[in-house]
Amino acid sequence: MMNRLLVFVMLGAAFMLVVSAVDQDAYEDVNMLKRGGTPCPCDGESMSGIIWFWSCPAGWRKCGAEWPAPCCKAIG
């Protein structure tokens, strides 16, 4: 019984290791939506920025429309 539990725990740990190693850049658009932002066109690219109300936060730059709210993109 203890051996089965140990095997189950080890397989779970291996699974979590593989899942956490997934390339996070592939999910940039999904992560953007998780931050609560609405996507907007930025620098001629399709939907690469997000709308921030009032002004862009630190670490972000204006890259698109000014009205009704600025379109911002992360620097870097």
UniProtKB/Swiss-Prot annotation:
Residues 1-21 form the signal peptide. InterPro entries: Myo_ane_neurotoxin_sf. It is found in: Secreted; Nematocyst. Disulfide bonds join C40-C71, C42-C63, C56-C72. It comes from the Eukaryota. The keyword Secreted applies. The keyword Secreted applies. Keywords: Cleavage on pair of basic residues, Disulfide bond, Ion channel impairing toxin, Nematocyst, Neurotoxin, Secreted, Signal, Toxin, Voltage-gated sodium channel impairing toxin. Residues 22-33 form a propeptide. GO terms for cellular component: extracellular region; nematocyst. May affect sodium channels (Nav). Belongs to the sea anemone sodium channel inhibitory toxin family. Type I subfamily. This is U-actitoxin-Avd7a.
